[in-house]
C-alpha cells in the first residue's frame, strides 16, 4: 500500500562484494493506523544490519539483511513500517564450483490456448463487475472458518504494460541523468549492451528480454513488489471494507517472468483474539500457469466482531 508514498522500498541491498550473491527476500509490511486522503509523511530508514541463518550441508553462508522504513504522518504518528529484506549468499573461493548452466536455463515462455485465455478473460470480466469483492458487506470474525479458501484472483499473462504500471506506482522511475547517477559508481554491476556499447541499468531486466539475458536470465522478470501487490488483491476482496490489514509478511520463492500467469490463492490459517482485537491469519500465495509458487505471504487481518458490534448499541 505504502510503496506509492516513497521512492520504492527501503535502501538495503548496497553490499557489493565479489563472490557474494544478493537476492530479494521479500518484505514485511506493518500497518499501525489507517493512511487517509490528505495525509502527509516524512520517512526514514533504519539499517538493522545482517543476521546469519544456518545452512546445513551448503557450501555458502547465508545472511539476511533487514532495513525497516518508517512512515511518519503529519501528526507525528508512525502509520506504517515496511521492512525490506535481502538474502546474501557468501561462498568461499575454495568451495565455488563452475556454473555452466545459467539460472532458469530451461525456462520456456508458455503459449496460451483459447480455453486458457477464455478462463483468464472471464476472470477479468468478473473483477470488473465486482464479483468476489466483499465490499460493504461486513465479514464478521465469528463467521470465519479456519481452513476455508479465499476466492482465486487471476493476473496475467504479465507484460510490459503491467510492468510500467508497477514502476509508476512504486516511484521506480529512472531516466537519463538520474539513471546515470544511480549506476555510475558501480558500473561493474551493469553490463554493456553489445548492440549499443552503453551500460544497461539493472532495472531494465524487468522490461526487456534482451536486457534480462545480459543479466543472466532468459526473460524479463516481474518486480518483487508487484508480486506482493497481486497477493493483496485477493485479501482485500475477501475481507471487505470494514476490515484492516495489520501485517503482510512475504517471501520471494522464485522468479516470475513476463508471459507468466499469477493465480492468487489462499486460505484461513487461524482466527484468534489478541489485545482485544479479533484477528485472522491468512496464508496467501501466487502460482504460475504450471502451478509453481513464486511468492507467498502471511497476512494478519483485523475483522469486526459481531458480538462487540451489537453490544455497542
Listing of model-derived features with the role each one plays in the protein:
Residues 1-26, 90-242, 306-313:
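Hot-dog-fold acyl-thioester-processing enzymes
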Residues 22-32, 244-253:
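Small beta-barrel nucleic-acid-binding modules, principally OB-folds
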Residues 26, 31-146, 152, 165-167, ...:
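HotDog/MaoC-like acyl-thioester-processing domains
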Residues 206, 218-222, 226-273, 287-289:
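Catalytic-pocket segment enriched in acidic/His residues
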Amino acid at each position: 500500500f505504502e510503496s506509492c508514498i516513497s521512492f520504492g522500498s527501503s535502501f538495503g541491498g548496497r553490499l557489493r562484494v565479489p563472490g557474494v550473491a544478493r537476492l530479494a527476500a521479500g518484505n514485511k509490511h506493518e500497518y499501525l493506523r489507517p493512511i487517509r486522503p490528505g495525509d502527509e509523511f516524512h520517512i526514514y530508514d533504519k539499517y538493522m544490519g545482517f543476521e546469519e541463518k544456518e545452512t546445513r550441508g551448503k557450501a555458502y553462508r547465508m545472511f539476511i539483511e533487514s532495513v525497516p522504513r518508517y512512515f511518519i504522518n503529519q501528526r507525528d504518528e508512525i502509520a506504517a513500517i515496511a521492512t525490506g529484506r535481502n538474502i546474501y549468499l557468501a561462498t568461499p573461493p575454495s568451495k565455488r564450483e563452475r556454473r555452466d548452466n545459467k539460472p532458469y536455463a530451461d525456462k520456456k515462455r508458455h503459449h496460451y490456448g483459447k480455453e486458457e485465455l477464455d478462463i483468464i478473460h472471464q476472470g477479468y470480466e468478473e473483477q470488473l463487475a465486482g464479483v468476489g469483492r466483499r465490499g460493504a458487506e461486513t465479514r464478521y470474525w465469528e463467521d470465519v472458518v479456519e481452513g476455508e479458501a479465499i476466492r482465486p484472483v487471476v493476473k496475467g499473462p504479465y507484460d510490459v504494460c503491467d510492468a510500467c504500471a508497477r514502476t509508476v506506482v512504486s516511484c521506480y522511475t529512472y531516466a537519463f541523468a538520474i539513471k546515470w547517477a544511480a549506476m555510475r559508481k558501480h558500473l561493474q554491476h551493469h553490463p554493456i549492451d553489445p548492440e549499443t556499447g552503453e551500460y544497461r541499468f539493472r532495472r531494465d531486466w524487468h522490461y526487456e528480454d534482451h536486457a534480462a539475458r545480459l543479466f543472466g536470465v532468459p526473460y524479463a522478470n516481474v518486480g518483487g513488489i508487484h508480486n506482493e501487490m497481486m497477493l493483496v488483491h485477493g485479501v482485500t476482496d475477501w475481507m471487505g471494507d470494514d476490515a484492516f490489514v495489520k501485517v503482510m509478511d512475504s517471501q520471494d520463492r522464485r522468479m516470475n517472468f513476463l508471459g507468466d500467469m499469477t493465480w492468487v490463492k489462499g486460505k484461513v490459517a487461524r482466527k484468534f483474539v489478541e489485545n482485544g482485537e479479533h484477528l485472522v491469519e491468512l496464508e496467501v500465495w501466487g502460482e504460475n500457469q504450471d502451478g509453481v509458487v513464486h511468492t507467498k505471504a502471511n497476512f494478519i487481518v483485523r475483522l469486526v466482531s459481531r458480538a462487540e458490534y451489537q453490544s455497542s448499541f
